């Protein structure tokens, strides 16, 4: 017994074969591939907001897919003050293209999320995710215990407990001192004693323990909350911590220009949604750049305004004047309508003259058809009317003045015809809305030639 194959066969209606029986994909499969490919190339909302969404696995750390590297709260401690210049450079799309290469972007149409992180990623520092951001490492913050051979130094240290020297504000000194058991009140003598070089009998390990070195990330600086937006009146001295690293003679005399609050605000400003409007024209018209929907609308508006400027300028090259194909179509329609109006203006006086001559020469006027007139009645004035048809009714009136008898007879006939026309109206066939102007003109000319 044969086992049924696991591949699902598509119906014969959706599979079409080419000339030599080549299999072509079904419409369902084609639609599915188109949707998947288009969504991947465009990058959905979850990609633009830097959320992993369905593209990444659930167990992945957020640093693998997002810019959690750049959200490190200790960024200003690790990097020097030139981090601001790095951040301003990475705000342009051109640097992103230089990261990945134009060929890579042109092939896939999407910048990989793992390569979107900036150049100034702190590789030496431990990566903090959102849950541990802002917390000090308990292992690195504690001073390393000292193992010394000098008993005098051990006894002197045992009598007075080791105090962690941290440069903080006055309102935090009480909290720190209360956490340390049996600690004397915080004063300047402790700071000077801890910053003093070691004694002559102590070795290097004791010197390391006395200066309380910590990890290179934290540098014994307490995490300070960001200044609130309403505290702008506070001076800079109260906002900035005293960046002092008590390592003997290496005490920092001047604080760096970049504080933790400023670096975080710079990083937060990179995701401001209004940055898509502040693009230059070169970036807007760059087809390789990843554009959001608002950028696409801006691009369309600018392109359409360019089209209008080109079409309004009559001195431009006529082959380039109609950049928008719809404009040429509309202008052709207007020209044909104007041509039809001019033709109608020429035809109306001829038509009126024809009716006028028929009133004057034919007393037995057929009310059902105004064009069935005798050829003998119109033979006299036909050539003159055609020759003077360009000049309209004025020229035809001058030709009718040549014969006074014909004019008086035509007036009497027209008066009698008007009295009869009140009872019997002239039947004029109605034209449909979809009737072309050309057919009407041809019909009028044909009737004129028959008359």
UniProtKB/Swiss-Prot annotation:
Alphabetic keyword roster: Cell cycle, Cytoplasm, Meiosis, Phosphoprotein, Sporulation
Residue stretches of biased makeup (Polar residues): 129-162, 228-242, 362-376, 407-417
Chain positions found as Phosphoserine: 70
Alphabetical list of InterPro entries matching this protein: TORC1_cplx_su_TCO89 (IPR018857)
Subunit-level organization: The target of rapamycin complex 1 (TORC1) is composed of at least mip1, pop3/wat1, tco89, toc1 and tor2.
PTM annotation: Either Thr-10, Ser-11, Ser-12, Ser-13 or Thr-14 and Ser-214 or Ser-215 and Ser-247 or Ser-249 are phosphorylated as well.
Pfam families: TCO89
Chief location bin: cytoplasm
Compositionally skewed regions (Basic residues) per UniProt: 419-430
Compositional bias annotation for Low complexity: 7-17, 203-215
Location in the cell: Cytoplasm
Family affiliation: Belongs to the TORC subunit TCO89 family.
GO biological process, one term: sporulation resulting in formation of a cellular spore
One Gene Ontology CC term in the entry: TORC1 complex
Full protein name: Target of rapamycin complex 1 subunit tco89
